[in-house]
Curated annotation (Swiss-Prot):
GO terms for molecular function: GTP binding; GTPase activity; translation elongation factor activity. InterPro entries: EFG_II, EFG_III, EFG_III/V, EFG_IV, EFG_V, EFG_V-like, EFTu-like_2, G_TR_CS. NCBIfam families: EF-G (TIGR00484), PRK12740.1-3 (NF009379), PRK12740.1-5 (NF009381), small_GTP (TIGR00231). GTP binds at residues 19-26, 83-87, 137-140. Belongs to the TRAFAC class translation factor GTPase superfamily. Classic translation factor GTPase family. EF-G/EF-2 subfamily. It comes from Lactobacillus delbrueckii subsp. bulgaricus (strain ATCC 11842 / DSM 20081 / BCRC 10696 / JCM 1002 / NBRC 13953 / NCIMB 11778 / NCTC 12712 / WDCM 00102 / Lb 14). It comes from the Bacteria. It is found in: Cytoplasm. Pfam families: EFG_C, EFG_III, EFG_IV, GTP_EFTU, GTP_EFTU_D2. One of its GO terms (cellular component) is cytoplasm. This is Elongation factor G. The gene is fusA. Residues 10-285 form the tr-type G domain.
Length: 694
């Protein structure tokens, strides 16, 4: 079976390209595809013509939204690349890609170093144990500073970044890079789009600095590898092969992160970074075996082996204009031919894979079979959704699913006509299938459709997609914040439901202790002794509470972070039922509300604003006026970086305010940080607006 493989597992790399928005990630991916022979014309993101940014919305905005998977070849290796979005509204795409990658390239902007979204994606990569190399991009930009960028990796991410190159010049003097292993300089020919470069001895004016940086690099590698340290201290000669092998081991163990320099836009340094992908990032054989669970819940290690039973994870659903519903899969073990049946173990359903495709940003090649370690697109899977496990029908396994964050912002959408209503229903069903952080629901009282997501941009793009892909004309309401409610004071309450109406009555009686459970969500404890509430009714009490908590106690927002301990109650031999105990539990919650110090929680965003110093006063004033708490300030490349915590409700329309107050020179990013109680006056306003119970 294995002989049909085009590339061995050792020569396969599954990598992601991750970065802050505008660090040049898509351009970097473009160049990789250009040099590996996958595209013949280079597309520029800022001209709206990039091969990877294949959805119309991305072309218009010049940002990457969907992680398009694409395949390239470099030095007899196959590199599968997942392009991930750098905008925080699309964090689920990043999480989703990290689940299926073996390694990643983090792209930094040489002028800015580590930025807020870099921190986010770096943390997520740490979470999934993904080895990384770093590409310091935009070395040709004014203010580019390689050493500052390396330092920011150490200081802001606590990452052991080891520079394996030294740039030759910077800004408009950036000519190429010096390889600190081979001690040669790669100098680029300006006219040949960077496809041509010359390897020359290190120029005299750089020799001394390059020698000292090489020494520093060897010392840093020695610190993460005992064998090298021994030779280093003993003054022995250490070969480049030994150094590279040690750095590879340290990178795979997340003890080191090799750093490269270049300018993707000017086509410099990308090829050496590709060598780094091959030299330092893992093949599917180098990563820890993926852990799945069998039907009994036992752990099963999935080794990358074509001869084992098939197991794969569906990590993305896309609606492709040419082939319809496309499921991106990562194969962990075994192989699969097109036309075969698989078991969707998450839903316990058999599905047939019609065709298998190898994806290039928005074109595709049909392939007869996929093998372990491959990433491919499958057509024909009708019921499979993001995070589902696809396995050999004779060996069902569940691969752990994705951790999906709850949406923080909501808007109402009103179709313009009856025909639009029908189209909108279809559109929302497709879009929610594709993106688990996008939700659509109908308010049972008002009948209006509400969509919720990770931020204003996220919802804007979904509405645009409804219009463009499904021809839905709709009116969009004002954005609403996804508030939550919680209890702040421990309390006990009874919920008793008795109904007598001829024949069989209803009887349920519970005493529940409610305590605040900050940051831990809802927990239920059964503390019943002596059977005062029979075993079979206890799950109904839990279910009744969870159901009641969905609509809160103050203004109809979900109640979170509460521990409920069922400790007493009573039942009736004939009249008690699961339904009665469900109602009793919801009554206990209602009765507790007035004594439990119920409050409304609002989402607090971690906001970072970058603006020239002359606008500092305006920016800080504007943040304070929005109930923002300053968290600190730093200097960065001639600008001030302001960190603050600001309630989401105050951030609507901030982009416009910032643009006008800084004459378009200020930028900001925000990411959800935590929930915090609203000030009393704002809470009263929210309750009044929602017609709740103050």
């Amino acid at each position: 079976m294995a002989n049909k493989r085009e590339f061995s597992l050792e020569k396969t790399r599954n990598i992601g390209i991750m970065a802050h928005i505008d660090a040049g990630k898509t351009t970097t991916t473009e160049r990789i595809l250009y040099y590996t022979g996958k595209i013949h014309k280079i597309g520029e993101t800022h001209e709206g013509d990039s091969q990877m940014d294949w959805m119309e919305e991305e072309k218009e905005r010049g940002i990457t939204i969907t992680s398009a998977a694409t395949t390239a070849q470099w030095k007899d290796h196959r590199i599968n690349i997942i392009d991930t979005p750098g905008h925080v509204d699309f964090t689920i795409e990043v999480e989703r890609s990290l689940r299926v990658l073996d390694g990643a390239v983090t792209v930094l902007d040489a002028q800015s170093g580590v930025e807020p979204q870099t921190e986010n994606v770096w943390r997520q990569a740490e979470n999934y144990g993904v080895p990384r190399i770093v590409f310091v991009n935009k070395m040709d930009k004014i203010g580019a500073n390689f050493d500052f960028s390396v330092k920011s990796l150490h200081e802001r991410l606590n990452a052991n970044a080891i520079a394996v190159q030294m740039p030759i010049g910077a800004e408009d003097q950036f000519e190429g890079v010096i390889d600190l292993f081979d001690m040669v300089a790669d100098v680029y020919d300006e006219d040949k789009l960077g496809a041509k470069w010359e390897t020359i001895p290190v120029p005299d004016e750089y020799k001394e600095e390059a020698e000292s940086r090489r020494e520093e690099m060897i010392e840093e590698i020695a610190e993460v590898d005992d064998d090298i340290m021994e030779k280093f201290l003993g003054g022995e000669e250490i070969s480049n092969e030994e150094l590279k092998a040690a750095l590879r081991r340290a990178t795979l163990d997340l003890k080191a992160f090799p750093v490269f320099a270049g300018s993707a836009f000017k086509n410099k340094g990308v090829q050496m970074m590709l060598d780094g992908v091959v030299d330092y990032l893992p093949s599917p054989l180098d990563v820890k075996p993926y852990i799945a669970h069998d039907k009994e819940g036992n752990e099963v290690e999935l080794l990358a082996d074509d001869n084992k039973p098939f197991a794969a994870l569906a990590f993305k659903i896309a609606t492709d204009p040419f082939v319809g519903r496309l499921t991106f899969i990562r194969v962990y073990t075994g192989s699969l031919k097109s036309g075969s049946y698989v078991l969707n173990a998450s839903k316990n359903q058999r599905e047939r894979v019609g065709r298998l495709l190898q994806m290039h940003a928005n074109s595709r090649t049909e392939i007869p079979e996929v093998f372990s370690g491959d990433i491919a697109g499958a057509i024909g899977l009708k019921d499979t959704t993001t995070g589902d496990s696809l396995t050999d029908p004779a060996h069902p396994l569940i691969l752990e699913s994705l951790d999906i964050p709850a949406p923080v912002i909501q808007v109402s959408v009103e179709p313009k006509s009856k025909a639009d209503r029908d189209k909108m229903d279809v559109a929302l069903q497709k879009l929610t299938e594709e993106d688990p952080t996008f939700r659509a629901e109908t308010n049972p009282e008002t009948g209006e459709t509400l969509i919720s997501g990770m931020g204003e941009l996220h919802l804007d793009i979904m509405v645009e997609r409804m219009k463009r892909e499904f021809n839905v004309e709709a009116t969009i309401g004002e954005p609403q914040v996804a508030y939550r409610e919680t209890f702040t004071v421990p309390t006990q309450a009874q919920g008793k439901f008795v109904r007598q109406s001829g024949g069989k009555g209803q009887y349920g009686d519970v005493w529940i202790e409610f305590t605040p459970n900050e940051g831990k969500g809802y927990e239920f404890e059964d503390a019943i002794v002596g059977g005062v509430v029979p075993r079979e009714y206890i799950p109904s009490v839990d279910a009744g509470l969870q159901e009641a908590m969905k609509n809160g106690v103050l203004a109809g927002y979900p109640l979170i972070d509460v521990k409920a301990k069922l400790y007493d109650g009573s039942y009736h031999e004939v009249d008690s039922s699961e339904a009665a105990f469900k109602v009793a539990a919801s009554l206990a919650l209602k009765n507790a509300a007035s004594k439990a110090g119920a409050v409304i929680l609002e989402p607090i965003m971690k906001v970072q604003v970058i603006a020239p110093e002359e606008y500092l006063g305006d920016v800080m004033g504007s943040i304070t006026a929005r109930r923002g708490q300053m968290e600190g300030m730093e200097d960065r490349a001639g600008a001030k970086v302001i960190n603050a915590m600001v309630p989401l409700s105050e951030m609507f329309g901030y982009a416009t305010t910032l643009r006008s107050s800084t004459q378009g020179r200020g930028t900001f990013t925000m990411v959800m940080d935590h929930y915090s109680p609203c000030p009393k006056s704002i809470q009263a306003e929210i309750i009044k607006k929602r017609g709740g119970n103050a």
